[in-house]
Amino acid sequence: MAKIAKRVSKTREGIDPNKAYALGEALKLLKDRSSVKFDETVEVAMNLGVDPRHADQMVRGVVNLPNGTGRSVRVAVFARGDKAEEAKAAGADIVGAEDLVDIVQKGTIDFDRCIATPDMMPLVGRLGKVLGPRGMMPNPKVGTVTTDVAAAVKASKGGAVEFRVEKAGIVHAGVGKVSFDVKALEENIRAFADAVTKAKPAGAKGNYVKKVSVTSTMGPGLKLDVSTLAAS
């Protein structure tokens, strides 16, 4: 415990909790203070001026990060026939129909992202209580209910990140690894912030983006100067 406390103290050394850091400066600080033996995930959190309890203030979408996420994503596809073959050829890890529904209903979820063809949704709909709480339920709004399964699989494998606002009005996502260079992380974060901004719902009033922060798995949370998130 003493070692952990010492490491936490060291990572926060010199960090001003009241300062809004420029994006590049914040990322350099996170990289410089990484002292663990694994490649930490860099995560961005955006506090939005919405109340997701109201349907017209829901924020949801998907963004393709230009430099990927740095993590291996296992993709499951619910499809039959030619579409199942297309999914396999595109690199899907698990492909099935009724058999895959049965497996998931029994509680075996050996994947990170789920795609379905439209004709499979009556079956996949039975899995709402299992996949819904995990944020894995296929949805046409984020491109995971589609006839173009090959493109969806490749996007999922290549850096597609889904986002959805939580009860407190916060939307967050992993946007890369500490091992990424600063430029790659900046590009990913700007792409994410831009996607969230464009997903502003009609019911949102007043200041939409209230606060943005960036952190790493074991690192400090740094408040960002929102003006530095705009594409340069």
UniProtKB/Swiss-Prot annotation:
The keyword Repeat belongs to this UniProt entry's keyword annotation: no
MF-aspect GO terms: rRNA binding; structural constituent of ribosome; tRNA binding
Keyword terms: Repressor, Ribonucleoprotein, Ribosomal protein, RNA-binding, rRNA-binding, Translation regulation, tRNA-binding
A GO-annotated cellular component: cytosolic large ribosomal subunit
Classification via CDD domains: Ribosomal_L1
Top-level taxon: Bacteria
Signal sequence annotation: none
Biological-process GO terms, alphabetical: regulation of translation; translation
Gene3D superfamilies linked: 3.30.190.20, 3.40.50.790
Function comment: Binds directly to 23S rRNA. The L1 stalk is quite mobile in the ribosome, and is involved in E site tRNA release.
Family recorded in the similarity comment: Belongs to the universal ribosomal protein uL1 family.
Quaternary assembly: Part of the 50S ribosomal subunit.
Listed name of the protein: Large ribosomal subunit protein uL1
Lineage: Bacteria, Pseudomonadati, Pseudomonadota, Alphaproteobacteria, Hyphomicrobiales
